[in-house]
């Protein structure tokens, strides 16, 4: 007989922040161009916010699913919820039972949208600097190897970047991207992120009208960059306001993430995850 459908009480949807990328006991590995996080769905870090929220709700790992997917954008998550899979140049994820699982969840948290600007920026940097090999140079940082950025890790990053042999033309293209291109990407992504989030809420509400849903807000992923020169500050502040209004419109909770402590790789520290868990649990109590 076919195995009974697993029923999770708490399902966490989102990107690498949800997955706990960068935490020492997160379970993930690169498989060619893609990440394999299947072992993380229930083997997630004890320090990630999903573990702490589950603990706060009195739930075990058997009752909790961490569906955090590295490099996932809001449109990808919408496709994943609608069809059970999503694939592009940088992602390849499949959760064929997701819709059925969502129907039975009591709590669903959604943290998505930061990659709507970060992934296009990475592609822009790769394009400006000569293509796919740029990702190979920067991947150790994205994978959490440089979270503390000590002397040896900085030297390794410098060696990786020096090996690219950037031409004057590529340097010019990169400077243009950094000067105005990032701000343009931020502006262009606002409407699509909100549209995808609204469609996602409609899907979740249709699948499970009784579930408690929490939209998790955004933080500045590059806090060391001063505010006047940091386009992310304005972008995520504006997006937070818009997403909070969207949450009110659809009668779901909103958990602010504005003061999340971040490591050098733009992912939360263990303390950052603890803060996010507190914010989510607080939102669920309202």
Label the model's feature ranges.
Residues 2-69:
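Serine-esterase "nucleophile elbow" of acetyl-processing enzymes
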Residues 19, 73, 222:
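Flexible, glycine-rich phosphate/dinucleotide-binding loops
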Residues 21-25, 77-79, 119-123:
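Short, solvent-exposed loop/turn and secondary-structure capping segments
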Residues 26-37, 83, 125-129, 232:
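Glycine-rich, phosphate-binding/catalytic loops in enzymes
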Residues 69, 74-104, 193:
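Catalytic-core regions of hydrolytic enzymes
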Residues 92-270, 274-285:
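Alpha-helical cap/lid subdomain in secreted, periplasmic
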């Amino acid at each position: 007989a076919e195995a009974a459908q697993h029923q999770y009480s708490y399902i966490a949807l989102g990107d690498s922040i949800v997955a706990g990328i960068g935490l020492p006991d997160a379970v993930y590995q690169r498989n060619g161009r893609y990440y394999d996080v299947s072992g993380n769905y229930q083997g997630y870090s004890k320090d990630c916010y999903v573990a702490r929220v589950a603990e706060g709700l009195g739930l075990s790992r058997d009752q909790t699913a961490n569906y955090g997917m590295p490099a996932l954008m809001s449109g990808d998550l919408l496709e994943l919820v609608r069809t059970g899979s999503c694939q592009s140049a940088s992602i390849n994820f499949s959760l064929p039972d997701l819709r059925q699982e969502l129907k039975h969840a009591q709590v669903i948290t959604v943290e998505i949208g930061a990659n709507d600007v970060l992934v296009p920026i990475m592609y822009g940097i790769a394009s400006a600097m000569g293509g796919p090999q740029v990702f190979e140079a920067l991947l150790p940082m994205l994978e959490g190897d440089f979270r503390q950025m000590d002397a040896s890790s900085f030297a390794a990053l410098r060696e990786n970047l020096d090996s690219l042999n950037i031409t004057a033309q590529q340097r010019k293209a990169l400077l243009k991207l950094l000067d105005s291109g990032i701000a343009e990407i931020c502006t262009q992504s606002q409407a699509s992120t909100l549209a995808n989030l609204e469609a996602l809420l409609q899907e979740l509400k249709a699948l499970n009208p009784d579930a408690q849903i929490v939209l998790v807000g955004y933080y500045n992923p590059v806090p060391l960059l001063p505010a006047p020169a940091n386009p992310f500050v304005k972008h995520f502040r504006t997006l937070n306001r818009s997403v909070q209004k969207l949450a009110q419109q659809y009668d779901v909770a909103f958990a602010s993430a504005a003061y999340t402590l971040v490591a050098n790789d733009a992912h939360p520290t263990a303390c950052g995850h603890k803060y996010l868990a507190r914010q989510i649990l607080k939102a669920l109590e309202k």
